[in-house]
Swiss-Prot record:
Organism this protein belongs to: Pyrococcus horikoshii (strain ATCC 700860 / DSM 12428 / JCM 9974 / NBRC 100139 / OT-3)
Any single Pfam family the record assigns to this protein: PabTrmU54_TRAM_dom
Keyword Membrane in record: no
Binding site for [4Fe-4S] cluster: 63, 69, 72, 139
Keyword Methyltransferase in record: yes
Name under which the protein is recorded: 23S rRNA (uracil(747)-C(5))-methyltransferase
Amino acid sequence: MEMRGKITKINENGLGVLGNILVPFAYPGDEVEVTETRERFGKIIARDFKLMTPSPLRIPGKCSHFGKCGGCLWQGLRYREQLKLKEEIFKRITGIEAEIKGSPRIWYFRNISNFIITVNGIGFKEFGMPKTVVNIRECPIFSERTPKYLKALKDFLRESNLKPWNWREGDVHYLQVREGKFTGEVMVNIIAHVPLNYREALMEAFNFADSIYWSLKADKKDDPRGFPTLVLGNEVIREKVEGITYLIHPSVFFQTNSYALPLLLKSVEKFCEGSKVLDLYSGIGTLSLYLAKRGFEVTGVEVNGTSVEMAKRSAEINSINATFIQGKAEDAELEGYETLIVDPPRKGLKEFSRRIVKKGPNTLIYVSCNPLRFILDYRNYLSEAYKVDDALLIDMFPHTPHIEAVIKLVRR
């Protein structure tokens, strides 16, 4: 299918809209000529297009891989326009007007990156093409040291003669790198399908890292997950945000933008009522530790045992008094608190919302990177007992359409 015209708007997934065609890397005001399309999930997506007349909102991309790599749909859009679009998209999805706070840094802000290692290249997947890899040289949203990390990986692969992933089999699958943006510490984690037999080569290639892990992957799923074993260095790396040192292990989640994290922490604190706070899906205690340091009496509940261990150890080294319990958030005792914080996985709360409706406190703070899931939880369950009192958006993900929302709900 071919079509020429002007992009009229951006859809909820960050794609330009041209009639019934969705155009990646295109922005309102762009005049484009779509020359090739494909169908995916019932949608017609532009596979190739020519930019005939650029929108005044457009700027040159900083990255040489922009336009192919699927990581940064909006890198060619002025940052203030990105923020405006995120407010508009959030309102379109939820019906809620909310102010957005921009990230203090919009380049080299990510503290984690997962480089897929394949026979076709090492890097990130092409937009909409899950088996096509962009062989990258740089990544301006992750780290200025990306070329150094990739060179070390290639040196190791050459010395070890290990085979890259070919979508069915292979020895090594991912290189995961984490950086402490405020500590300078680096963790390297190789996700592989074979045990480590080239320890010396690995240590030599990544001799700059503070922590080196080898994670054995038991399945063939295309994700950067395995069972980590420490090869050399420290068990954890540290990140320091708002005066709190957080301990980070390869098996845990940490917010990906260390520079914007203070905005998220302060937004949650602003919405808290009373002194007794229950933090569900608390992870390594990112919110709990900050709130406890600010004087709240906080209990965090998290199912991941390693995350709970990191939270407890972080509390100890920071001399912070907070309680952390390992268990399912859905089984937590909800009574006796004045504020409940939920930061669920992307699938949302679903049926657990019914218990919150019955037994939750007067104030509920819903932290979400998935506005659609939030509004489904709200309309289907939470609205029975709660109403939206306030909301703030934090741009944790510049150059992408992703939105982090903090929504305050109060009992009707």
